[in-house]
Design a protein with these regions (language model features):
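Amphipathic alpha-helical interaction surfaces in cytosolic regulatory modules
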Residues: 19-88
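STAS-typified acidic loop motif
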Residues: 1-31
Length: 88
């Protein structure tokens, strides 16, 4: 299963990155690069994410702490992010 990231501008200065598939390995680096390049207010939509690894969770936790909104996050990922943030 691959990872797909679709960028959608939803108004002036607001962008949603819709992530689907497997967010692990090289795909985490791809998402990291996209997040670093973005100058708009960001929302990550994780509705269609099926699998993440530890690096993905760390990335999500850091960016959520820095103001990126995470929508439609599967419960197991949400819990993992919460635990990661507690350890930061």
């Amino acid at each position: 299963m691959t990872c797909k990231i679709h960028r959608e501008a939803i108004g002036e200065g607001r962008v949603v990155l819709r992530v689907s598939g497997r967010l692990a390995g090289d795909n985490v680096d791809m998402l990291r690069t996209l997040l670093q390049q973005e100058n708009n207010v960001l929302t990550l939509d994780l509705k269609d994410v099926r699998l993440v690894d530890g690096e993905a969770v760390k990335l999500l936790a850091i960016h959520e702490s820095n103001g990126v909104r995470i929508d439609n996050c599967p419960l197991y990922i949400r819990e993992w992010i919460r635990r990661e943030r507690e350890g930061m």
